[in-house]
Amino acid sequence: MNRRKFIEQTATVTFGLACMPSLLTAKQKQEIIFGHNNKRYRIDTKWGVLDFNRYPVKDCHEMVQDSKGRIILLTNETKNNIITYDKKGKLITTWGSEYPGAHGLTIFNENGEEVLFICDNNRHQVIKTTLDGRVLLTLNYPKETGEYSKPDEYVPTETTIAPNGDIYVADGYGKDFIIQYDYKGTYIRHFGGRGTEEKHLKNAHGICYDNRDKNNPVLIVTSREQHAFKRYTLDGK
C-alpha cells in the first residue's frame, strides 16, 4: 500500500490520537471534522483507546497498514514500541522494548512475506524485522560512504523500499544523505547531503518510492527546511 492511500485511510486515526482531551470534552456531543476541500475526515474518539498505564505511548511518529488491514503503530516508548490494532481499533498485540529512538516505520512485501523497517534515532540504525518483531537485518551507520566518522553523525528518519528490495535510507536528522543498499544490506551509493545546489537537501526527513509513472519511477524526498519536495532518479540524479 502506498503512503498516499494509507494516509487517506488512516487520517481519522491519526487526528483522533492527536486531539487534546479538552477538545474532545468540549465537542463530545458534536461531530468533529478536520480537513479541507474534498479531503475531510470525521474523528472517531473511541477508536483505539487503551489503558495508558498498560500500553503507554510517547511519540507516535508513524503508522502503517498491512495486507490484512491491521494498523501498526510505532512509538519510542520502550514498554511497547509496536502496538497493532485491527480495523475497528481493537488491540491485537504489542512488542518491542529495544527501540528508544523509534522514528520511521516502513512496511514492505518481500516475496509474499511482509516485513518492517524501523529507523531508530538513538541507536543510529535501521532495523528490519518480521511483523512479530524478529530481527532480520540491522544497518549500522554508513561508514563505507566516507561521509561519517562516528555513529552519532547518522540519525535516520525514514526508509523506502524499491520493488527489487533496494533500501533507501533518509538521514534526515544527520547529514541529510540518502543511502542506498541492496536487499541484503550491501551499500550501493549515496546522494543528496547538505549544500546549496539543487541536488542537496536540508533536513531530508521523509522519502518515498513514487511509481505513478510505471516506466519512470522516482524517489520523492522532503527537504523540510526548504519547504520542498525533491525528485530523484533511483540512482540519485
Each model region followed by its residue ranges:
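N-terminal export signals
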Residues: 5-25
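Short loop/turn segments that connect beta-strands within beta-propeller blades
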Residues: 86-88, 130-132, 182-184, 233-235
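Beta-propeller domains
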Residues: 73-93
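Blade/loop signatures of beta-propeller domains
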Residues: 27-45
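Beta-propeller fold detector
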Residues: 43-48, 93-96, 136-143, 188-193
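Beta-rich, blade/repeat-based domains predominating
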Residues: 53-68, 98-113, 144-166, 196-218, ...
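Conserved beta-strand positions in repeat-built beta-propeller and related beta-rich domains
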Residues: 73-77, 116-121, 169-172, 211, ...
